[in-house]
């Protein structure tokens, strides 16, 4: 993982030993590099124009301390719930730098978004448009909106993270766009700023991005010819990170070409990157509980479970696994598994590792879709989160306690 260094056999994040962090704060524990997070965001901010917007996808990692850090650097935010919106406002984000995506926005969430006058509510269906119009009328306030297009394009990634196919729940199919825009315009309650699309996550093929962009440009030009004053194209997010030696697309190389296509049309760009900002900033540290040998396999049973980090179980996702301190021990093939009472509670199969029962493991690239997807399954306590920058260490979420686990059940 980028941002990790091995010094005299010990693994470091920034200038801090992961072994020392595990000993100080216990395991499992998430650890993030603040310097890597800043570097990733700046890779986007330095590649766009002043009027363009980079809106970090909050769902990838929504810890408020990270949101504050990103807001201070000038990031906008892409939210998919009312509470994500509230978190961003609490973190100091400007409403004009927030977009609200997602297919199931409640009336309460729409009231909040319209009252706060956020940059855009991205409309996902005619039924949602009807609700937005009604809410705006009740509030006597215009809603700022873009229309999300379903481009029917595959992101060539896991089916669960493809969002641009015709069969997905997201966005408006092309044949429904004109009538939807006409309804929005006639209402007098919608300020239509542009059109949006998001193909999906883990994109490594640049052609998919430009297939989507060219479709959006064609649709935007058609709407502009009809008299609609659009100013933005929201291209979504989706640039992939390298979990297993995939060749990453660099923001600058992609965005220079994107902007060159938008400039002649006087259209601004909005992006919603998530994983490519937070993904490679974090590790999940876990200690060995048992080294179990059967006639066929060696199991490394660790103290992290699928409740702590779901991606390997849910998506069969590959994450590199390293020992935080190298030891003089024979390398063996291990099945790295957790303690949860599910056969799917696995983190890696046939991993070649040199281990003993005191070893601490680092599961790499766990900064996105890690803690945010954790749960209390098996009545397990969710882990803490630590932010490291240089030599500075900050606890940004404490470890849950048994009292925390009971509180919502007892205090009723």
List each language-model region with its residue ranges.
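Conserved, mostly hydrophobic/aromatic
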Residues: 37, 59, 81, 113, ...
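Charged (often Lys/Glu-rich) extended helix/loop segments that serve as interaction or gating elements
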Residues: 257, 266-412
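General structural feature for long, well-ordered alpha-helical segments within catalytic domains
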Residues: 17, 33-36, 40, 44, ...
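Active-site loop/helix belt of alpha/beta enzymes
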Residues: 2, 152-291, 347, 353, ...
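Active-site beta-loop-alpha junctions enriched in small/polar residues
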Residues: 57-63, 80-83, 103-105, 124-126, ...
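A charged N-terminal "starter" segment
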Residues: 1-143, 187-191, 225, 349, ...
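Short acidic, glycine/serine/threonine-rich loops at helix termini
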Residues: 67, 90, 110-115, 132-135, ...
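Structured core elements
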Residues: 76, 99, 120-122, 146-148, ...
């Amino acid at each position: 993982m980028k941002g990790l260094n091995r010094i005299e056999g010990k693994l470091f994040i920034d200038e801090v030993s992961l072994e020392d962090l595990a000993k100080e704060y216990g395991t499992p524990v998430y650890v993030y590099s603040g310097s890597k997070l800043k570097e990733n965001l700046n890779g986007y901010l330095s590649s766009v124009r002043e009027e363009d917007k980079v809106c970090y996808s909050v769902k990838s990692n929504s810890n408020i301390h990270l949101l504050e850090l990103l807001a201070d650097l000038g990031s906008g935010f892409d939210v998919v719930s009312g509470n994500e919106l509230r978190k961003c406002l609490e973190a100091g984000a400007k409403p004009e730098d927030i977009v609200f995506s997602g297919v199931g926005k409640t009336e309460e969430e729409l009231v909040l978004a319209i009252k706060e006058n956020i940059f855009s509510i991205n409309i996902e269906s005619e039924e949602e448009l009807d609700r937005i119009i009604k809410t705006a009328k009740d509030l006597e306030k215009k809603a700022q909106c873009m229309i999300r297009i379903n481009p029917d394009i595959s992101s060539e990634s896991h089916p669960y993270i493809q969002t641009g196919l015709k069969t997905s729940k997201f966005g408006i199919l092309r044949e429904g766009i004109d009538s939807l825009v006409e309804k929005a315009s006639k209402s007098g309650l919608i300020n239509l700023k542009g059109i949006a699309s998001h193909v999906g996550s883990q994109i490594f093929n640049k052609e998919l991005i430009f297939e989507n962009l060219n479709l959006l440009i064609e649709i935007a030009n058609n709407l502009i010819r009809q008299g609609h004053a659009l100013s933005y194209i929201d291209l979504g997010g989706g640039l992939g990170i390298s979990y297993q030696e995939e060749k990453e697309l660099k923001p600058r190389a992609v965005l220079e070409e994107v902007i060159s296509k938008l400039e002649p049309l006087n259209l601004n760009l909005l992006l919603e990157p998530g994983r490519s900002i937070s993904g490679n900033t974090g590790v999940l540290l876990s200690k060995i509980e048992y080294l179990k040998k059967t006639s066929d396999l060696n199991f490394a049973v660790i103290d992290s479970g699928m409740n702590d980090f779901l991606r390997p179980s849910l998506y069969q996702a590959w994450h590199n696994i390293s020992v935080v301190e190298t030891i003089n021990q024979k390398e063996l093939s291990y099945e790295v598994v957790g303690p949860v009472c599910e056969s799917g509670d696995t983190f890696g199969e046939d991993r070649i590792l040199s281990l003993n029962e005191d070893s601490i493991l680092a599961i790499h690239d766990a900064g996105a879709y890690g803690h945010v997807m954790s749960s209390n399954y098996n009545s397990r306590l969710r882990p803490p989160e630590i932010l490291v920058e240089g030599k500075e260490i900050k606890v940004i979420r404490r470890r849950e306690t048994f009292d925390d686990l009971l509180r919502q059940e007892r205090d009723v």
